[in-house]
């Protein structure tokens, strides 16, 4: 009991002091073709950032959307998100791989994916009118306290997640909404952390599936049992928040990372671009994106004493086997027995 109370106290302290876990999707891969996503840590500071398939967002710190904003448009595609100016073309039945950075993803929780038909160009659609239907959702896989989660599968595949576009989806322009919900602090009100990411895709095919959807601001409520929950208990029964997966669709597909073999730029309505073949490709590494490259990745020197973790990365906790030292000026702060984080 004393240990559980201690867990709750440190979790509350983490929430009160604004401790966050950070990440965004750096790129997506469709049938071996690499597309750049929106980078909130660099694009806002560029005079002419590239047109990409990912929606822009004002999460300059790789931060999250909290439950008190669930009825705010920020929950739809992240903070102050605006439409991506381009899209990627996919066929119904294709798989799309998301690459999260930085690695490893530090927090336990579910992973969910949604689609919303734009009924026109997604580049100009009003996000508050989008009606999302869930095409997959994976939560607690086994155990408890905290157990094995969808996020652990993502970590084991180098921070990647694969989603399948339904085989029988009606053709059209869609916003694909991918999301991790971090639950390490969810035992306290407003403690869950949502990381929604949106992408424009143009789906081709001959299917007829057109599920009804839910407005983004109606997907979740702060008191949903899958949002307000202490995961540091066992046994644990977890209910993934939001609408159920569309009837007849699998809750997930086989997961695994793979190297891209070509690159492509986002297609702009009225224009076009295509894959650029590459003669050399590299497999994913734990600190690099999935983009093909013919040159070795840049390296940076680390303080003496072995590898270090980046700011806001995990540096300790039960079952953790990565770096336990933080790159200066950050220090490793223990939040609970299961998680320690590099903080300033």
Swiss-Prot record:
UniProt entry keywords in alphabetical sequence: Carbohydrate metabolism, Cellulose degradation, Copper, Disulfide bond, Glycoprotein, Metal-binding, Monooxygenase, Oxidoreductase, Polysaccharide degradation, Secreted, Signal
Biotech uses: Lignocellulose is the most abundant polymeric composite on Earth and is a recalcitrant but promising renewable substrate for industrial biotechnology applications. Together with cellobiose dehydrogenases (CDHs) an enzymatic system capable of oxidative cellulose cleavage is formed, which increases the efficiency of cellulases and put LPMOs at focus of biofuel research.
Gene Ontology CC: one annotated term: extracellular region
Record-listed O2 binding positions: 184, 193
Matching PROSITE patterns: CBM1_1, CBM1_2
Database matches in InterPro entries: AA9 (IPR049892), AA9_LPMO (IPR005103), CBD_sf (IPR035971), Cellulose-bd_dom_fun (IPR000254)
Region annotation Disordered: where it falls in the sequence: 262-310
PTM per Swiss-Prot/TrEMBL: N-glycosylation at position Asn-158 is important to determine C1/C4-oxidation ratios.
GO MF annotation: an example: monooxygenase activity
EC number(s) recorded for this UniProt protein: 1.14.99.56
Residue intervals passing through the bilayer: none
Consequence when changing residue 105 to A/F/W: Leads to lower C4 oxidation and higher C1-oxidation
A Pfam cross-reference name: AA9
Positions contributing to Cu(2+) binding: 22, 107, 195
Cofactor note: Binds 1 copper ion per subunit.
Chief location category: secreted
Coiled-coil features, chain-numbered ranges: none
Family listed: Belongs to the polysaccharide monooxygenase AA9 family.
Role noted for this protein: Lytic polysaccharide monooxygenase (LPMO) that depolymerizes crystalline and amorphous polysaccharides via the oxidation of scissile alpha- or beta-(1-4)-glycosidic bonds, yielding C1 and C4 oxidation products. Catalysis by LPMOs requires the reduction of the active-site copper from Cu(II) to Cu(I) by a reducing agent and H(2)O(2) or O(2) as a cosubstrate. Produces both neutral and oxidized cello-oligosaccharides from cellulose. Also acts on soluble cello-oligosaccharides as short as a tetramer.
Name this polypeptide is given: AA9 family lytic polysaccharide monooxygenase cel61A
Organism this protein belongs to: Hypocrea jecorina (strain QM6a)
Encoding gene (name): LPMO9A
């Amino acid at each position: 009991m004393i240990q559980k109370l201690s867990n709750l106290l440190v979790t509350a302290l983490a929430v009160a002091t604004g401790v966050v876990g950070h990440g965004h999707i750096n790129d997506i891969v469709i049938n071996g073709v690499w597309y750049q996503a929106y980078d909130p840590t660099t694009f806002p500071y560029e005079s002419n950032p590239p047109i990409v398939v990912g929606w822009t967002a004002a999460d300059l710190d790789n931060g999250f959307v909290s439950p008190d904003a669930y009825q705010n448009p920020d929950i739809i595609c992240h903070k102050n998100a605006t439409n991506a100016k381009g899209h990627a073309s996919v066929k119904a039945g294709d798989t799309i791989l998301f690459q999260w950075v930085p690695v490893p993803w530090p927090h336990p929780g579910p992973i969910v994916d949604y689609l919303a038909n734009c009924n026109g160009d997604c580049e100009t659609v009003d996000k508050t009118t989008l009606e999302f239907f869930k095409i997959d959702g994976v939560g607690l896989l086994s155990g408890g306290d905290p157990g094995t989660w969808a996020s652990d599968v993502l970590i084991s595949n180098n921070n990647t997640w694969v989603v399948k576009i339904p085989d029988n989806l009606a053709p059209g322009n869609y916003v694909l909404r991918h999301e991790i919900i971090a639950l390490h602090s969810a035992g306290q009100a407003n403690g869950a952390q949502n990381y929604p990411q949106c992408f424009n895709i143009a789906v081709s095919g001959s299917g007829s599936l057109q599920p009804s959807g839910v407005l983004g601001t109606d997907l979740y409520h702060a008191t949903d049992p899958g949002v307000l929950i202490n995961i540091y208990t066992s046994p644990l029964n977890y209910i993934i928040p939001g609408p159920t997966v569309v009837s007849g669709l699998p809750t997930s597909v086989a997961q695994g990372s793979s190297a891209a073999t070509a690159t492509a730029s986002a297609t702009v309505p009225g224009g076009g671009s295509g894959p650029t073949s590459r003669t050399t490709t590299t497999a994913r590494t734990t600190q690099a994106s999935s983009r093909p490259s013919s040159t070795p990745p840049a390296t940076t020197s680390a303080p003496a004493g072995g590898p270090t973790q980046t700011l806001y990365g995990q540096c300790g906790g039960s079952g953790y086997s990565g770096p336990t030292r933080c790159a200066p000026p950050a220090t490793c702060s223990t939040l609970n027995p299961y998680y320690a984080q590099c903080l300033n």
